[in-house]
Amino acid sequence: MSSLSDLINFNLSDSTEKIIAEYIWVGGSGIDIRSKARTLPGPVSDPAKLPKWNYDGSSTDQAPGKDSEVILYPQAIFKDPFRRGNNILVICDVYTPAGEPLPTNKRYNAAKIFSHPDVAAEVPWYGIEQEYTLLQKDINWPLGWPIGGYPGKQGPYYCGIGADKAYGRDIVDAHYKACLFAGINISGINGEVMPGQWEFQVGPSVGISAGDEIWAARYILERITEISGVVVSFDPKPIPGDWNGAGAHANFSTKSMRENGGYEVIKKAIEKLGLRHKEHIAAYGEGNERRLTGKHETADINVFSWGVANRGSSIRVGRDTEKDGKGYFEDRRPASNMDPYVVTSMIAETTILWKKS
């Protein structure tokens, strides 16, 4: 008799051409991820060839019970690292039956910005550093921390190794490999300053694909922690006190910034970001005021600043960029729970499209 693990790992391609497509979308809170699966007659590689679908929006805080149907529009396809074979993960955005985007559909406006000819011509690149915290199930306390107590002070945990410094590496490594299998442009991982906190990086990714890849990577991480009986938190300051928060630093460049003379373009872009600081902060994640205190490698939330190699500034420029006279900059303000569609498109809009009045 087959064991459960045998059935979970069963290769469908040996017996049928049919595949399983897991449709994934963002729920009513703007950070919760939902998904459900359907059978398709055969392999699909183009999201435009996937059928639209629907779900009960009243159960995700996205529609009233008397008119609960919400429509899923497939937008991006990734290989399914859990079912494998020809099975796929499908990133969707959400609409009313009349075709209007829901308020939680941040992809819709982002796609409009990225399709603007001036933005498309600049080929915007993003590298997102997604930090997160692993929590012990049921007690809302970081993995590896003594229950009701605290580990030793910060210092040995950043990029640390050893059973007394790195908690949850098996989850992190499984996630890394699963993202590579899925076709996500994940570029690295590392342990963070607070024990139980980790980071993965996605990019360089062009335009709207950065948001699609971050949401797909978050979904895969949620699934792996589900299997492991661990909870993943994207709270920007999960533990109060003298502990680092969790961010989602956004590294950004345009074609003009990557070419000779690009450093001057970067400085003009940073000036624009400073003029719209309040608007960006308002869109960069809930609870970010608990993280952006001017301590723990952050800038004060109320003060815009930038500097070369300064991790205490709002915007950091790397020394290589300064030396080469071209490159990229890092926006250190986004919280770990930010919507990547909002952050990436807003940076492009401000630096490329927005004009000072």
Swiss-Prot record:
UniProt keyword list: ATP-binding, Cytoplasm, Ligase, Nitrogen fixation, Nucleotide-binding
Domain of life: Eukaryota
GO biological process entries: glutamine biosynthetic process
Matches recorded under InterPro entries: Gln_synt_N, Gln_synt_N_sf, Gln_synth/guanido_kin_cat_dom, Gln_synth_cat_dom, Gln_synth_gly_rich_site, Gln_synth_N_conserv_site, Glutamine_Synthetase
Compartments it resides in: Cytoplasm
EC number(s) per entry: 6.3.1.2
Assembly and oligomerization: Homooctamer.
Entry's family note: Belongs to the glutamine synthetase family.
Name of the protein in its database record: Glutamine synthetase root isozyme B
Organism per entry: Pisum sativum
Catalytic activity: L-glutamate + NH4(+) + ATP = L-glutamine + ADP + phosphate + H(+)
Pfam family membership, one: Gln-synt_N
